[in-house]
């Protein structure tokens, strides 16, 4: 079993449980590493100093039992200077770059996504997807992120493909262009289990066809639960490992503190999990 997660939310942002409750759950699951990744974006702005202080306290309290890392999930449109001292950074794109008087997060609700498409892209979902992936392609340049979060989040409400066809070249073209560009920059991607483990999507992020393309491009992966509740901390890890191996991946990346205290990237063999 994979015993690490680096996409973890708490009551500091939009999570249900406290950071210490997440630590206790990680210990119950016999985790080796737990990374916290509170949101910092225009709709969820944490008390950064309080967050860092609590994660630091937990790291010291549970030293020798669990390797605890202090990260952040930062949106492409936000400033990395807002989170000084983060040990790792998830680069996520939750928005399209438009000026509207209502929430512009593409995972806010199905109704908001449709309104964004109608009012900003003339009802053309493929145009909105292109704009999304053009912004996604900039995530490493803008944030110098450790890995890319939920790459195809724009499909959040599209499991039945009623809004757009995820096999259509008008969708796959911009998605693959962004993915290939990011892989060429050396940044890893996560397999994000969050919508799957909460019963919101049948697919993981990225979907199977894009995950296979990521392998073919030479990309590297993390596997994360995107947990907002303790019960989801390792949710759908078994599915993610199986799909990664089916797409040709042999290893998964993990982050760990070195003896000197720096954060290092290691790899684990998927067939040993």
Please state what every model-predicted region is.
Residues 12-13, 93-96, 101-217:
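Domain-core and long-helix interface of multi-subunit machines
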Residues 1-8, 19, 156, 161-273:
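Charged catalytic cores and adjacent phosphate/nucleic-acid-binding surfaces used
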Residues 25, 57-58, 135-139, 243:
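A generic secondary-structure signal
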Residues 31, 86, 144-145, 219, ...:
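A structural motif
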Residues 34-36, 89, 148, 189, ...:
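Hydrophobic residues within beta-strands of alpha/beta enzymes
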Residues 2-130, 232:
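A metal-dependent hydrolase metal-coordination microenvironment
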Residues 27, 82, 140-141, 215, ...:
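Non-catalytic positions within long, well-ordered alpha-helices that form the structural scaffold/packing
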């Amino acid at each position: 079993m994979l015993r690490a997660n680096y996409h973890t939310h708490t009551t500091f942002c939009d999570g249900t449980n406290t950071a210490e409750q997440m630590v206790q759950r990680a210990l119950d699951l016999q985790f080796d590493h737990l990374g916290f990744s509170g949101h910092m974006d225009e709709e969820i702005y944490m008390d950064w100093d309080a967050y860092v202080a609590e994660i630091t306290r937990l790291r010291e309290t549970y030293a020798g039992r669990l390797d605890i890392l202090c990260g952040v999930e930062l949106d492409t449109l936000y400033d990395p200077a807002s989170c000084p001292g983060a040990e790792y950074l998830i680069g996520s794109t939750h928005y399209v770059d438009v000026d509207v008087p209502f929430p512009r997060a593409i995972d806010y609700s199905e109704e908001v996504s449709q309104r964004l498409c109608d009012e900003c892209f003339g009802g053309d979902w493929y145009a909105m997807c292109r704009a999304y992936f053009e912004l996604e392609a900039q995530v490493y340049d803008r944030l110098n992120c450790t890995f890319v979060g939920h790459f195809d989040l724009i499909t959040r409400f599209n499991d039945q493909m009623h809004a757009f066809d995820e096999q259509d070249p008008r969708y796959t073209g911009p998605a693959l262009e962004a993915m290939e560009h990011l892989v060429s920059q050396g940044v890893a991607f996560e397999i994000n289990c969050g919508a799957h483990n909460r019963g919101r999507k049948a697919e993981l992020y990225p979907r199977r066809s894009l995950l296979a393309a990521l392998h073919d491009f030479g990309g590297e992966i993390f596997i994360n639960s995107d947990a907002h509740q303790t019960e989801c901390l390792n949710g759908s890890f078994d599915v993610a490992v199986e799909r990664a191996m089916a797409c040709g991946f042999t290893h998964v990346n993990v982050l760990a503190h070195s003896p000197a205290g720096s954060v290092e990237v290691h790899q684990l063999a998927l067939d040993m999990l």
